[in-house]
């Protein structure tokens, strides 16, 4: 029995041309009806109702058809882009997706560079294309961490012209942080991947002066692979502890706060992933939510407390980190497992006052409130009190991100009767912002969010369209799940399914398939040695979960010991420097005493020192 062959692409170039250029009204209705049938067929192949799983799902074919269908004008284009965004958000990671992912990346970049960038105004289709591009490169970066992009050098080279055009288009999106943040993520991802796989800087020729804040200096060009930072590693460990209900969670969260200063370091792509993974854990656990909010609070207050790291008002990616956080905390507000988690993400941990008072915005002439948390309403008051025409980019981008996500939250809550109080509070907050805020950048956030959603109507009037996604609901969970299997692999589960050739004869059951051995050391993680057989023989053989808990505890202890050794070394260096400074001060003080003694007594001897002449007497 031959394997099932999927049909060739239903959407052809001729169909797209006829759909976009027909003037006959009857023919236009026929083509529109045919296009709607294509969308129904694509929805089934994408598995939108089953999170991309099922025998009827064939993602490579469906993704290609949808990106072709997105070239049709009007409602079909919007429907196709919404379907593609939802699919890229929720499907699991599989190596067989890589060729089609690169095809999607090239198609999206081509549409942006050759069509969208040439338009005088910003269109909702352009926003959707950027969001889709962000999800594509986010998935490519996860595959890169697994070491699966070695055979795709030609695909990477094909992206170079579009990446150059994207690089030059960045300044035109300065007023739109939601778009600029995604574009910078795409460019940084491409830069890191190309430096590792192609061994050259993508934008090196475009920089006249070396960027002191470049985040590609930490990329390893040897066989040991890309090295993730401690913040990302421990965030994945925290998510694993929450999923398996392991007792090491508090210790892992302590490690995360120990490495909180890494949010200010150069590898900001790892920091963004760390926030994304920790945000998924925060949807399930209050301690993780508190750690996530503490990280951002420290990040925003770091100029006042950190001397060894650059001020966040000086580093170019700080606004990207802040905007990404506003999206993550908004997702926690909407999709957290309990009402307490959702309420805390919205108003913070303080319960000593009426939540309605948090909606009040601080007047510019009043005393600026201190930052006492990183909930949505706390950040809203903090940013709104500090915004001005010449304020730091971090301030107005953070304010923009809060307002932008509040609009999307109010739209997402349409028709949800169980969350009337929550929706009412979000709506009242937005109304106060519209009445109070006169800054055009913040007013622009409301307009852009409504344009992205294709809806500026009353959020209480109707339910949201089922296929239009305001937030990426599943990609964080997929990434956390995949990275946890990569960082903490079990004996019987692989991090990602291996790409296997298609067999033409399914009846050959006894055929032995030859696979290339997996490459080790993609991510450098130091593990402790296994205990000896003699130690294990004295006790009953532990089950899988006991062994997993023990192994995770050993890994955490190992990293904690390394952190403590590093801290001791730093303290020893500081103590030695302090002793040296004290000795230097004492030496200078003694010299001053001797000068005063010589000036007053005309003697050069030390105090209480007997001269030879005095000895003779």
UniProtKB/Swiss-Prot annotation:
Spans traversing the lipid bilayer: 129-149
Chain residue ranges for the region called Disordered: 598-617
Keywords: Cilium biogenesis/degradation, Coiled coil, Membrane, Transmembrane, Transmembrane helix
Subcellular location: Membrane
Coiled-coil ranges from the UniProt annotation: 567-604
InterPro entries linked: TMEM232 (IPR031747)
GO CC, one annotated term: membrane
GO biological process, one term: maintenance of protein complex location
Membrane association type: Single-pass membrane protein
PANTHER family associated with the record: TRANSMEMBRANE PROTEIN 232
Role of this protein: Plays a critical role for male fertility and sperm motility by regulating sperm cytoplasm removal and maintaining axoneme integrity.
The protein, known as: Transmembrane protein 232
Organism: Rattus norvegicus
Source organism phylogeny: Eukaryota, Metazoa, Chordata, Craniata, Vertebrata
């Amino acid at each position: 029995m031959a394997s099932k062959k999927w049909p060739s692409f239903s959407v052809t170039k001729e169909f797209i041309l006829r759909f976009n250029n027909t003037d006959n009204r009857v023919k236009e209705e026929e083509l529109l009806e045919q296009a709607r049938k294509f969308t129904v067929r694509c929805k089934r192949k994408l598995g939108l109702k089953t999170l991309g799983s099922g025998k009827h799902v064939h993602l490579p074919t469906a993704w290609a058809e949808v990106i072709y269908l997105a070239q049709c004008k009007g409602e079909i284009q919007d429907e196709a882009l919404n379907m593609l965004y939802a699919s890229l958000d929720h499907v699991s990671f599989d190596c067989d997706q890589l060729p089609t992912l690169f095809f999607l990346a090239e198609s999206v970049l081509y549409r942006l560079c050759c069509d969208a960038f040439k338009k005088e105004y910003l269109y909702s289709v352009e926003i959707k294309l950027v969001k889709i591009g962000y999800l594509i490169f986010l998935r490519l970066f996860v595959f890169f961490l697994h070491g699966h992009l070695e055979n795709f050098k030609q695909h990477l080279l094909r992206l170079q012209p579009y990446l150059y055009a994207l690089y030059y288009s960045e300044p035109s999106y300065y007023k739109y942080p939601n778009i600029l943040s995604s574009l910078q993520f795409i460019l940084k991802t491409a830069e890191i991947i190309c430096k590792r796989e192609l061994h050259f800087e993508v934008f090196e020729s475009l920089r006249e002066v070396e960027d002191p804040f470049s985040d590609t200096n930490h990329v390893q060009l040897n066989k040991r692979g890309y090295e993730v930072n401690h913040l990302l590693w421990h965030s994945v460990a925290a998510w694993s502890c929450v999923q398996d209900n392991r007792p090491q969670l508090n210790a892992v969260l302590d490690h995360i706060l120990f490495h909180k200063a890494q949010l200010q370091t150069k590898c900001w792509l790892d920091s963004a992933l760390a926030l994304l993974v920790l945000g998924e854990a925060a949807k399930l656990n209050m301690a993780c939510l508190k750690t996530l909010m503490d990280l951002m609070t420290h990040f925003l207050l770091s100029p006042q407390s950190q001397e060894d790291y650059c001020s966040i008002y000086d580093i170019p990616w700080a606004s990207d980190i802040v905007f990404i956080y506003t999206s993550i905390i908004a997702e926690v507000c909407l999709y957290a497992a309990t009402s307490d988690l959702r309420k805390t993400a919205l108003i913070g941990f303080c319960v000593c006052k009426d939540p309605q008072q948090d909606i009040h915005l601080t007047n510019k002439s009043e005393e600026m409130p201190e930052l006492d948390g990183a909930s949505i309403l706390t950040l809203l008051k903090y940013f709104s009190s500090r915004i001005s025409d010449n304020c730091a980019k971090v301030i107005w981008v953070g304010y923009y991100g809060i307002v932008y996500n509040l609009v999307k939250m109010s739209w997402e809550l349409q028709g949800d009767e169980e969350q009337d109080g929550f929706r009412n509070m979000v709506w009242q907050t937005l109304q106060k912002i519209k009445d109070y805020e006169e800054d055009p950048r913040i007013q622009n956030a409301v307009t852009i969010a409504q344009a992205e959603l294709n809806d500026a109507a009353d959020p209480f009037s109707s339910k949201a369209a089922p296929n239009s996604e305001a937030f990426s609901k599943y990609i964080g969970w997929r990434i956390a799940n995949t990275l946890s299997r990569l960082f903490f692999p079990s004996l019987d589960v692989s991090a990602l399914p291996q790409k296997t050739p298609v067999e033409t004869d399914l009846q050959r059951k006894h055929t032995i398939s030859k696979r290339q051995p997996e490459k080790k050391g993609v991510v450098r993680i130091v593990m402790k040695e296994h205990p000896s057989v003699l130690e294990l023989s004295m006790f009953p053989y532990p089950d899988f979960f006991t062994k997993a808990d023990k192994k995770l505890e050993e890994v955490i202890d190992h990293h904690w010991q390394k952190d403590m050794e590093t801290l001791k070394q730093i303290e020893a260096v500081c103590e030695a420097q302090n002793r040296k400074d004290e000795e230097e001060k004492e030496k200078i003080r003694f010299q001053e005493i001797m000068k005063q003694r010589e000036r007053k007594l005309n003697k050069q001897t030390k105090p209480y020192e007997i001269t030879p002449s005095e000895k003779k007497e």
